[in-house]
Amino acid sequence: MIDQNVTKSEDNKFKILQAAKWYSPEVGGIETVAVAITDAVRDKAEMKILVCSGNKGKETGYTDEGVYIYRAKTPFRICSTPISFDYLGAFRKMSKDVDLIQLHAPFPLSDLALFLGRRSRKIKKALWYHSDVIKQRKLMFFYRPLLKWMLRKVDKIYVASRSIAEQSKYLGKHMDKVEVIPFGISTREYDKAERFPILTEALNDKNNVKILFVGRLVYYKGIDVLIEAMAKTSGAELFVIGGGELDESLKKRTDELGITDKIHFMGRIEKEELLAAFSDCDFFVLPSVNRAECFGLVQLEAMVYGKPVINTSLPTAVPEVSVHGETGLTVEPSNIDELAEAMNLLISDEELRKSYGINARKRCEDSFSMSKMQEKLYASYLELLGKK
């Protein structure tokens, strides 16, 4: 049941409803952005959050920071999209008397909720556009009209890089609404996290270099390419953190290649263990294979610990985050041999890893500051609401 008190607010604070698919402790780039948005306005505005119930089993209630989250009952999914009548009803109730609705795309359920809600034009609507829908082409037949309607109705569209807007099939007519706000990362949060040798302790050969992958085990992440490339490397072990639909097939392929001693499937782990893994690895690999990977925020989580990154030359912001020859290496998507060559180079050259790692940390501090991201977003909100 929705807490009726969440509609009350201090007179000097504007009120925001953030509607997303998932929220922390669910792990992912979009979830990280949703938390960053909350943190940007938490002390200056009243934020309430509507999401679907996720895999972590968290209940509706308040966060430690006092932010109200309603986790709608989600009985099933179609094409990875949650279906929830509870979400639609909660959106209508929670959007009452707010000043601003913050949405995320692509997410058909929240778009439908906005369409059915038909709230006053006085309520400003902002959208964080993460990427086009890439895989579920059949879904787009039904979703496209709703997405186009929603893009017309929102007052502001945020993207993490100009390339996301320029490569999109749907944002071209709405560039006047687009504002670029690069994702940020809080170096302070990562610096104060406990560090322990979570990967080192699991090594089969203590002399091996530790390679890390973190992400959902889904098609566009390119984890299958990474597994194949690992068969062409020596002197290293790969740690795979995350779960997803490809879990069993990846383990089977690892067994077929005879490299089970080189690959550790760790599944989903707690946040403190995840941060320890980033700090303990020697380098990070993001082998994504198509535009569904629009930014690769996870790269920053490795870079903040001074770790070099191998990424792919996608026509998105991915290679703009970690720069080839400066903070790591960039290879062609789906190119097993090129990926293996890049990994072998970093495996064999400790000094190169150190040099890239130093540059990676500096790039985080200079170009991807969480405080700068949040300041820019809050200023945009004030302008949108006519308070600036």
What positions do the PLM features span?
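An aromatic- and histidine-rich active-site surface loop
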Residues: 57, 86, 100-122, 127-129, ...
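A short, active-site helix/loop in glycosyltransferases that binds the activated sugar's phosphate group
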Residues: 152-190
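Short alpha-helical donor nucleotide-sugar binding micro-motif in glycosyltransferases
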Residues: 268-269, 276-281
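Short hydrophobic beta-strand element within catalytic cores of glycosyltransferases
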Residues: 308-312, 322
